């Protein structure tokens, strides 16, 4: 069972709530995904007062845990301010911390991220940092107080999948007891399954579901892929080989 900061969840799929064609389609996708955690941007929630209230009512009606994020923040100060606002609005100490360093790739700023994480952890937040796949950055975030890490698979919204599976596999081996979530870049369910097969605890999906032709069907596909990938990891899959290895025994086989 998935566990973040002492809270346990049956689903290992986290779902973002942005970019859906309509609120009803979002609700259908969340239900189809079986996800028990959704991410919410404070900027989206706070747009128009009535629209924000309707959106928040929809999320509460779904009965899911809310993970607010600091999407769009480019400095530690901006991210920290947004985190405090999110805690007031959503009534949770959880925060998905994003400090963007590059506007083209939306790559996280590792220095600003660690700085903001340290301050927020000291202030009682339970931080989910969106990061690259660098082990040293991961070490610093853990030292800052983070008990979850969210390395990217590829740039946000790119749909490229796992750009560097070697780095992700190394991170899993290096931090066997830290919950790891692949966040960003997942495009199709097979990408999610691959992440789970590496031993990651969960994946976070947004664009791949929200922008699909049928978001609810795609959400269900991702739910199945995540489950399949986790089962495969727990089943201890065989190692890849360079040479063939016969699967059919030769004993009793006729030789002509």
UniProtKB/Swiss-Prot annotation:
GO molecular function: thiazole synthase activity
Main location: cytoplasm
EC numbers for this chain: 2.8.1.10
Keywords (A to Z) from UniProt: Cytoplasm, Schiff base, Thiamine biosynthesis, Transferase
Superkingdom assignment: Bacteria
InterPro entries in alphabetical order: Aldolase_TIM (IPR013785), Thiazole_synthase_ThiG (IPR033983), ThiG (IPR008867)
Binding site for 1-deoxy-D-xylulose 5-phosphate: 157, 184-185, 206-207
Segments passing through the bilayer: none
Catalytic site: 96 (schiff-base intermediate with dxp)
Any Gene Ontology CC annotation: cytoplasm
GO biological process terms held by the UniProt record: thiamine diphosphate biosynthetic process
Cellular compartment(s): Cytoplasm
One Pfam match: ThiG
Catalytic activity: [ThiS sulfur-carrier protein]-C-terminal-Gly-aminoethanethioate + 2-iminoacetate + 1-deoxy-D-xylulose 5-phosphate = [ThiS sulfur-carrier protein]-C-terminal Gly-Gly + 2-[(2R,5Z)-2-carboxy-4-methylthiazol-5(2H)-ylidene]ethyl phosphate + 2 H2O + H(+)
Protein's pathway: Cofactor biosynthesis; thiamine diphosphate biosynthesis
Record note on quaternary structure: Homotetramer. Forms heterodimers with either ThiH or ThiS.
Family to which this protein belongs: Belongs to the ThiG family.
Described function: Catalyzes the rearrangement of 1-deoxy-D-xylulose 5-phosphate (DXP) to produce the thiazole phosphate moiety of thiamine. Sulfur is provided by the thiocarboxylate moiety of the carrier protein ThiS. In vitro, sulfur can be provided by H(2)S.
Protein name (Swiss-Prot/TrEMBL): Thiazole synthase
Organism encoding this protein: Brucella abortus (strain 2308)
Higher taxonomy: Bacteria, Pseudomonadati, Pseudomonadota, Alphaproteobacteria, Hyphomicrobiales
């Amino acid at each position: 069972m998935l566990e973040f900061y002492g809270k346990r969840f049956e689903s290992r799929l986290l779902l973002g709530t942005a970019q859906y064609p309509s609120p009803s389609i979002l609700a259908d996708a969340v239900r189809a995904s079986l996800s028990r955690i959704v991410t919410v941007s404070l900027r989206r929630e706070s747009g128009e007062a009535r629209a924000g209230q309707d959106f928040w009512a929809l999320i509460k009606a779904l009965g899911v845990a809310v993970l607010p994020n600091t999407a769009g923040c480019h400095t530690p100060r901006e991210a920290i301010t947004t985190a405090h606002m999110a805690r007031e609005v959503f009534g949770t100490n959880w925060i998905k911390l994003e400090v963007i360093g590059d506007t083209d790739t939306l790559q996280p700023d590792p220095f600003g991220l660690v700085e903001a994480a340290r301050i927020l952890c000291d202030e009682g937040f339970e931080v989910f940092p969106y990061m690259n796949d660098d082990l040293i950055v991961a070490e610093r975030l853990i030292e800052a107080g983070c008990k979850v890490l969210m390395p990217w698979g590829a740039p946000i919204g790119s749909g490229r999948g796992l750009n560097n599976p070697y780095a992700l596999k190394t991170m899993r081996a290096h931090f066997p007891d830290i919950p790891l979530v692949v966040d960003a870049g997942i495009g199709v369910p097979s990408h999610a399954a691959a992440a789970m097969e590496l031993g990651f605890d969960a994946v976070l999906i947004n664009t791949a579901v929200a922008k699909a032709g049928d978001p609810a069907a795609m959400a269900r596909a991702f739910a199945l892929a995540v489950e399949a990938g986790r089962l495969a990891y727990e089943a201890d899959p065989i190692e890849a080989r360079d040479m063939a290895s016969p699967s059919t025994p030769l004993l009793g086989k006729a030789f002509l």
